[in-house]
Amino acid sequence: MNTSFQAVCEAAAEEWDVAALAAGFSVGEGSPELAAVGCAPETPFRIASVTKPLTAALALSLLDPGEPTGVWPDDVRVRHLLSHTSGYDCELPEADLLRFGSGDDALARCAAELPSVERLLAPGEVWSYANTGYWLAGHLAAERAGASFEDALTERILRPAGLAETSFAEPGLPGTGADSLPGPYPRARRPSGGLSSTVGDLLRAGAFLLDSEQFGRMRIVHGKPVGGVYGLGLFGERLGGVDVWGHGGSWGGFQSSFLLVPDRRAVFAGLTNASVGGKALRRVEDAFFLHVLGEPRRQPGFVALTPEQRKAFVGTYRNDDGRHEVESAGDGLLLREDDDEQLALPVGERTFLIPSGPRVGDRFDFPRPGLGRFGGRLARRD
């Protein structure tokens, strides 16, 4: 690496005003390289949805991907829960899961309300991010194990992987930024994002997954998000002709990144306590890719759409995340969400990318007439 990894992390944290950032990578059997800014390398952060690959590994160790759930209709199978293709919405109608308490029955109480979740489409039709699927998968895995979800994950995944610093305890520092939240993480949400961990432990988790029996099934493509593909608990993309798998996380002022390059036996982990931390980590990821694959990620090229093509997407879209107002503007679309306004340019016939500003690189698309997908979640047009 021409520039030291520590220097890359320092520059990324400064550019995005991130209070604390820890990152590291390992390649093959070599010693891991770690860096930290504003914290120690071994500081535990909330990893949020980086929990999902570990939940998926647990579920696949206990459940058949083709079996029904017993909670949603029988056309919804375990594989749909783990691939965000269940057709169900992301959250319960009443989103505050703290109401289920902190007892061992919290996840079961949550699962009992899952029949009330809005069904958007039939399973397998369109990929739409759904935490609800992971709560149900975690509940089913716990039932099959005859234990709480936390105990099942610890005994079957965390302990065998040697993740001594990974747990459901609160992180070692607070989240910051517009998305920061006070109070504890709801126990019922834990299968979708409840773990706290360190960079070193996530590198060990990556090595464990690469060698695991479940990893091959986790890489079978089941859905297509706005960019790349999704297997069971892992996003996938190709970079320089090489497959890259992983997951990001975002919750309560923490953002995280976890990447696996199987052909190079390489693992990357990045943790921040900032609501814009993912943008800083993107720069650090590029340094990792340059080192391992010889090139960073490339932003897709923009394409030209006619005014008539752009007009087909204009309107107000709604989901339980809010209103998404879309207007035609210049060569692209103007997206308004709450007090935020972003110009996005087309990178495909139905896909748009924000080229600059605090949300640079974010994408949204329109997978079907009358449906938009914002932040990975489907929204219906009025």
What are the roles of these predicted feature ranges?
Residues 44, 66-67, 75-79:
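Alpha-helical scaffolds flanking conserved acidic
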Residues 16-19, 30-32, 72-256, 260-262:
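Short, surface-exposed loop or secondary-structure junction motifs
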Residues 37-38, 274, 320:
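A generic structural motif
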Residues 282-382:
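Peripheral terminal and inter-domain segments
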Residues 257-275, 373-377:
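Short, well-ordered beta-strand elements
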Residues 6-9, 23, 46-65, 137-142, ...:
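Active-site SXXK
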Residues 2-48, 65, 115:
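Short, conserved catalytic-motif segment at the N-terminal edge
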Residues 25-27, 238, 337:
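Residue-level signal for short segments within beta-strands and strand-turn junctions
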